[in-house]
């Protein structure tokens, strides 16, 4: 085999296999350099114990299924191209990674005698064409799965999988389940970037400017003292001594390591509270659960959800379904999206049930929701003006979220809801957009400002209030039953029919 020669990767040659149902056994480890392997028919590739392969990648032509029983090496990625299927079926822990841009990769690595198994240390999907199928939940650490430009499909294949972080560049990132057995996806999104750099600036004795929250130092009486800046500028430290002003400085000791750790801990605590946004899609036969997250972390979905037989559950946090701002070319360093732009893409959210407990849910602009909602001590806003934009959207860089408000100018940009809502235990429902469906409220409150609310099922309000505000219009096709207060504001309208 023509492989890498010394340090010359280009010495590696491409190899094309065209025989039918062939078998290849590696007697030694192979470093093929820039050479790739192309399979025009189905093959099985294995290796003697401990032998590995590295090279430019593997191409599986359309209609082929290559069974790959060879592990890689740490720090190297197996590149998969071609419309065919690559089934990973080695043994033990494969320390190498996977980058796939086409076709299907089935992860079916087998455990070694100690029970250890890992198909890849990391998986990256890009181009929108690849699919990765999980043989079981142990094949790869979900937190090491990422989606690049246009992404690809991760098929959970009936497994229960937990993510503590989602790394998705755009709408092409898809998490799905095509198996008959329902998958359970837990989005315990508490992970954060722990790589924190803490530079130490010098304090000018004559005053100056700096970055609030950053660490600074000054030598006083032969001793280095460390301070955290509290304001954008600070005064003279020679007279008037601004170091003693708690509005300008916070003294954090004389131990450099402890001072650095104090700043680092605060940065990490701040990151834990930062919202999480997923630009991709959740589809197929699965239930999705978002548990209570640290710091009251908000979760924003501006991709889409299509779980016609599934339940999405939110516990003790803020959940926002919204459309997606159209990405624009950057001009003179401007962000690709902004809160005040007028053009947004519509997004659909379809599920059997949206379950809310102690939660705050917003259906915002350019989002349509088709689902029943079960609410326990939660607040629901349909037609919310609350939105988030990712200032690095479409760049592939680290997410930078900006929160604000955005009110649609046209009817087509307004949110829409269709389904039946059950409110329990002091839940509240604010309807400010088009609503079609039913409402059952128990010890809860409903407030309507939308001129387009249609109850197609009998409305039931037990121990609950109903308020139709100025300009609101409620039409109940099958009657309205209430033992509580019903209030109608000026220029509001309640239309009843049926019994």
Where does each model-flagged region fall?
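Acidic Gly/Asp/Thr-rich repetitive segments characteristic of extracellular carbohydrate-active
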Residues: 1-14, 102-104, 113-125
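His/acidic/aromatic-lined binding-pocket segments of jelly-roll/cupin-type domains
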Residues: 77-79, 96-99, 122-123, 310-312, ...
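Short loop/beta submotifs within extracellular cysteine-rich repeat domains
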Residues: 113-115, 233-241, 327-328, 389, ...
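Tryptophan-rich substrate-binding surfaces of secreted polymer-degrading and adhesive proteins
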Residues: 196-266
């Amino acid at each position: 085999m023509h492989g890498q020669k010394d340090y010359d990767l280009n010495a590696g040659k491409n190899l094309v296999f065209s025989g039918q149902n062939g078998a290849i056994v590696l007697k030694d480890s192979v470093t093929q350099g820039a050479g790739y392997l192309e399979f025009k028919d189905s093959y099985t590739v294995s290796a003697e114990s401990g032998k590995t392969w590295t090279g430019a990648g593997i191409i599986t032509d359309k209609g082929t299924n290559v069974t790959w029983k060879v592990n890689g090496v740490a720090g190297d990625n197996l590149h998969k191209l071609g419309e065919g299927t690559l089934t990973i079926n080695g043994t033990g822990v494969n320390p190498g990674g996977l980058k796939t841009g086409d076709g299907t990769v089935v992860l079916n690595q087998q455990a070694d005698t100690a029970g250890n198994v890992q198909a890849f240390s990391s998986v990256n999907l890009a181009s929108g064409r690849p699919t990765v199928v999980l043989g079981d939940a142990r094949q790869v650490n979900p937190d090491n799965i990422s989606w690049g430009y246009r992404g690809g499909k991760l098929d959970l294949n009936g497994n229960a999988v937990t993510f503590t972080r989602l790394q998705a560049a755009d709408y092409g990132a898809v998490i799905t389940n095509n198996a008959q057995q329902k998958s359970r996806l837990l989005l315990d999104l508490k992970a954060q970037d722990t790589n924190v750099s803490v530079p130490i600036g010098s304090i000018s004795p004559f005053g100056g400017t700096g970055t609030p929250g950053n660490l600074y130092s000054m030598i006083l009486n032969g001793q280095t003292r460390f301070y955290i800046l509290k304001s954008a500028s600070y005064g003279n430290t020679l007279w008037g001594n601004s170091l003693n002003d708690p509005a300008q400085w916070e003294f954090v000791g004389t131990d450099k390591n402890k001072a650095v750790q104090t700043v680092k801990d605060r940065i990490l605590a701040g990151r834990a509270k930062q919202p999480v946004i997923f630009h991709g899609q959740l589809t197929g036969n699965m239930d999705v659960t978002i548990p209570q997250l640290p710091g009251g972390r908000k979760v924003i979905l501006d991709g889409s959800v299509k779980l016609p037989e599934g339940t999405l559950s939110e516990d003790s946090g803020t959940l926002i379904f919204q459309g997606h701002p159209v990405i624009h070319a950057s001009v003179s360093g401007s962000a690709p999206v902004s809160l005040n732009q007028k053009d947004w893409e519509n997004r659909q959210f379809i599920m059997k049930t949206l379950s809310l407990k102690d939660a705050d849910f917003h259906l915002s602009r350019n989002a349509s929701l088709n689902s029943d909602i079960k609410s326990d001590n939660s607040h629901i806003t349909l037609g919310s003006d609350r939105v988030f934009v990712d200032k690095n959207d479409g760049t592939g860089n680290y997410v930078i979220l900006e929160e604000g408000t955005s009110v649609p100018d046209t009817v087509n940009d307004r949110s829409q809801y269709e389904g039946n809502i059950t409110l329990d235990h002091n839940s509240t429902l604010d309807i400010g957009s088009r609503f079609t469906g039913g409402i059952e409220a128990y010890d809860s409150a409903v407030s309507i400002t939308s001129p387009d609310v249609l109850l197609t099922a009998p409305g039931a309000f037990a121990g609950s209030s109903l308020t139709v505000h100025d300009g609101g219009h409620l039409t109940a096709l099958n009657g309205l039953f209430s033992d509580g207060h019903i209030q109608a504001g000026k220029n509001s309208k309640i239309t009843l029919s049926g019994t």
